Design a protein with these regions (language model features):
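Central antiparallel beta-sheet cores of small beta-barrel/beta-sandwich binding domains
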Residues: 27-108
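Acidic, contiguous internal or C-terminal segments within carbohydrate-active enzymes
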Residues: 111
């Protein structure tokens, strides 16, 4: 019985730990449902970022960010950092932005 209680306490505590969002994620096209790209989510200096590491659709190969503004304008979409400056608030990653490379628009982002 004591072992069961210890096991239940252990699993309860592990459920309270935040799930890491870091790693490789696959994006999906909203309209077609096809897998569109691989995005690497990573931490740097305590902030969370996301970079497109590979475009999966043949028609997207070699595309550049035509509608982006500033330093991202004209850059290849593969390699573009699209998730920027998310801060951990103790419960979630907040106060960052995400770039839509198709439209060039920036949106508020949280995870």
């Amino acid at each position: 019985m004591t072992q069961l209680i210890h096991l239940l306490i252990y699993f309860s505590l592990t459920l309270l730990q935040p799930v890491s969002v870091e790693g490789l994620w696959i994006t999906q096209d909203d309209e077609s449902g096809k897998q569109k790209s691989e995005v690497l989510i990573y931490k740097e200096n305590g902030k969370l970022y996301g970079k497109i590491v590979r475009l999966l659709l043949p028609e997207d190969q070699g595309k550049i960010c035509v509608n982006c503004k500033g330093k991202d304008k004209g850059k290849p979409i593969a390699g573009l950092v699209i998730v920027n400056n998310l801060s951990w608030d103790g419960e979630s990653w907040e106060d960052g932005t995400i770039l839509d490379p198709k439209s060039g628009k920036l949106y508020d982002c949280y995870i």
